[in-house]
From Swiss-Prot:
Protein's UniProt name: Phosphoglycerate kinase
Source species taxonomy: Bacteria, Thermotogati, Deinococcota, Deinococci, Deinococcales
GO terms, biological process: gluconeogenesis; glycolytic process
InterPro entries: Phosphoglycerate_kinase (IPR001576), Phosphoglycerate_kinase_CS (IPR015911), Phosphoglycerate_kinase_N (IPR015824), Phosphoglycerate_kinase_sf (IPR036043)
Catalytic activity: (2R)-3-phosphoglycerate + ATP = (2R)-3-phospho-glyceroyl phosphate + ADP
Length: 411
């Protein structure tokens, strides 16, 4: 997996997402003796007051340490969950502060007042170089998701400079992402820079052959990515529930499988235009019900029996997709091949994880999307992937060709 690059030089890629100019990077920011406000993504799973998965926290450590080594004090700012009516205990970042302290190996002061309050301002003004504070959930502020001008001003007072290192939130035009950036000297953190560079390669400078694997339940969720990438790729392998919309569009029988009838014409059009590039499953694992203990059997993907539903790609397709990946120079995988949560329908996803992982040193490989990331971690191949994206919605919007407000703000 790609490490973070806190000493990153300006990106050589000319990203349209960043207004055609590279983002400002940390080495261009003078931080000695300054208080730096850092937007991180600490929207992590918490159970019984304890962080269950600290991946996003550890991913932010190199940027924080670089700032501390440069003589700064650091004020960390994040959202957590979707609180609707101001402060709620279950959405407090307090338990996260302890996990950040552990990851950094130093004390992190938690500031429980609202981020835009006078109390918070006084608390951060007392920080000395080398010290770190974590603000309370920025979504407790009513103006955050509205990119409220008054809140932007209040947040800007918390730092002498601003660093955006929350790629997972870079597609949101919120106060803590793009609003405050216009008020302070700013730069992209190492995590944001590595994400934009890695995904930028998929759009602007892919080596060929270029193979993309797209899975997941719905065509409608991924259609803009599919349409934007198809002209650029050599092969696109389709899996997951969305495969049945394509198979039905081609006249196949799909039984009770998931289908989006309102996407059939679109799927038909893509098959007519890019049929030579689009690879669909030839067999599927069908089940008599949507359950972990369902009866299952392997059938042709376009002959799912009535009353049955396809829940994974079959063994022939697994082999065909592994073969299609051989010789590739660039590979992007987003979305599971089947109902990965049920063990008996996880084989297709695991097979793709193994195939992508086996390409180390032969191809530039990027994996994005929660289930595909879980699968690559579970397969033990994560360290063989060039870049594992933490982005979710932000990754997809970038690959749709959209400008991300946070990335634009860092130019």
């Amino acid at each position: 997996m790609t490490g973070l690059c806190p000493l990153h030089q300006p990106s050589p890629l000319d990203h349209p997402h960043s207004g055609g100019t590279p983002m400002q990077n940390l080495s261009q920011l003078d931080v000695k003796g300054k208080r730096v406000l850092v937007r991180v993504d600490y929207n992590v799973p918490v159970g019984d007051g304890v962080v269950q998965d600290d991946t996003r926290i550890t991913a932010s450590v190199p940027t924080i340490k670089k700032l501390l080594d440069g003589g700064a004090s650091v004020v960390l700012m994040s959202h957590f969950g979707r609180p609707k009516n101001g402060p709620e205990d279950k959405y407090s970042l307090k338990p996260v502060a302890e996990a950040v302290s552990r990851a950094l190996g130093q004390d992190v002061k938690f500031i429980p007042s609202l981020p835009g309050s006078d109390e918070t301002l006084q608390a951060v003004q007392a920080l000395r170089p080398g010290e770190v504070a974590l603000l309370e959930n920025v979504r407790f502020e009513a103006g955050e998701e509205k990119n409220d001008a008054a809140l932007n001003d209040k947040l800007a007072k918390l730092g002498d400079a601003f660093v955006l290192d929350a790629f997972g939130s870079a597609h949101r035009a919120h106060s803590s992402v793009s609003g405050v950036a216009g008020k302070l000297p700013h730069a992209a953190g190492g995590l944001l820079q590595s994400e934009v560079d890695a995904l930028g390669k998929l759009l602007h400078a892919p080596e060929h052959p270029y193979v993309v694997i797209i899975g997941g339940a719905k065509v409608s969720d991924k259609i803009k990515v599919i349409e934007n990438l198809l002209p650029k790729v050599d092969r696109m392998l389709i899996g997951g529930g969305m495969m049945f919309t394509f198979i039905k569009a081609r006249g196949g029988q799909i039984g009770n499988s998931l289908v989006e009838d309102d996407q059939l014409d679109l799927a038909k059009g893509l098959l007519e235009k890019y049929g030579d590039k689009l690879l669909l499953p030839t067999d599927a694992v069908a089940a008599d019900k949507f359950a972990a203990d369902a009866q299952s059997k392997v059938v042709p993907a376009d002959q799912i029996p009535d009353g049955w539903m396809g829940l994974d790609i079959g063994p022939d397709t697994q082999r065909a997709y592994a073969d299609a990946l051989q010789g590739a120079k660039t590979v992007f995988w987003n979305g599971p091949m089947g109902v990965f949560e049920f063990d008996q329908f996880a084989a297709g996803t695991n097979a793709v994880a193994a195939a992508v992982g086996s390409l180390k040193d032969q191809a530039y490989t990027v994996v994005g999307g929660g289930d595909s990331v879980s699968a690559i971690n579970k397969s033990g191949k994560a360290d063989q992937i060039d870049h594992i994206s933490t982005g979710g919605g932000a990754s997809l919007e970038l690959l749709e060709g959209k400008e991300l407000p946070g990335v634009v703000a860092m130019a």
